[in-house]
Design a protein with these regions (language model features):
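Short cysteine-rich clusters marking metal-coordination/redox-active sites
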Residues: 9-12, 29-32
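Cys/His-rich microdomains that often coordinate metals
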Residues: 16, 36, 76
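Short linker/helix segments within small regulatory modules
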Residues: 18-27
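Short Cys/His-rich micro-motifs in 6-15 aa windows
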Residues: 32-41
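A short beta-strand-turn-helix
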Residues: 41-60
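Short pre-active-site segment immediately N-terminal to redox-active cysteine/selenocysteine motifs
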Residues: 57, 64-68, 111
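Typically the conserved alpha-helix immediately C-terminal to a functionally engaged Cys/Sec
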Residues: 71-86
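Non-catalytic, surface beta->alpha helical segment in thiol-disulfide oxidoreductase systems
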Residues: 111, 116-149
Length: 150
C-alpha cells in the first residue's frame, strides 16, 4: 500500500492528499483542478509560505531574493531549471524579501540569494550565494540524503 502525502496547491493553497505513486503522474488539485506540479517555482507571501512549509509533506526549497539583487537575477533561470529536475520530490518556491520583509527577518536572512530547505515545518539546511542549476540540484539531493528527507 502506498503512502498518502499532503501536497499544497501552488494556485489555490488548498492541501491535497496524493498517493505517493501518483506524484509523477501529473496530479491536479482537487479544489481548483490546476496541476499540483508544473516544473517551475512559484512566489510566496507570508500566509502562503506558512501553509507550504508547514503542510507540505515533501521538502520545500525556498529562494529568498530581492528585485535589486544582481546575483538573484542571475540565479533565477537556474532555480527554474532546478525546479524542472527536482519536482515532484521537492517543491520550489521564491520569497521576495523586499516585498515580504517579515519573512526575511523571521528567518534571519542577511545575504541574498539564500536557499533554505524546509521539511516538516522547520528549516533543515541553508546555502547562501548564487548557484548554477546543477549545483542547486546536487546541493538539494545531498541535503536530502544526509537528512533522510522525502
Amino acid at each position: 500500500m502506498f503512502e498518502k502525502l499532503h501536497v499544497v496547491c501552488p494556485n489555490c493553497q488548498i492541501t491535497n492528499r496524493i498517493a505517493s505513486e501518483h506524484l509523477t503522474s501529473e496530479p491536479n488539485c482537487g479544489s481548483c483542478h490546476q496541476p499540483l506540479f508544473n516544473a517551475s517555482s512559484f512566489n510566496l507571501d507570508e500566509a502562503s509560505f506558512d501553509k507550504h512549509v508547514s503542510r507540505n509533506e515533501i521538502p520545500v526549497l525556498v529562494d529568498f531574493w530581492a528585485p535589486w539583487c544582481g546575483p538573484c537575477h542571475q540565479m533565477a533561470p537556474a532555480f527554474e531549471h532546478a525546479a524542472s529536475q527536482l519536482e515532484p520530490d521537492f517543491r520550489l518556491a521564491k520569497v521576495d524579501t523586499q516585498a515580504v520583509h517579515s519573512l526575511a527577518e523571521r528567518f534571519n536572512i542577511r545575504s541574498i540569494p539564500t536557499l533554505a530547505l524546509f521539511q516538516g515545518g522547520r528549516e533543515v539546511a541553508r546555502q547562501t550565494g548564487a548557484m548554477s542549476a546543477p549545483d542547486i540540484v546536487r546541493w538539494v539531493q545531498a541535503q536530502a540524503l544526509a537528512r533522510n528527507l522525502g
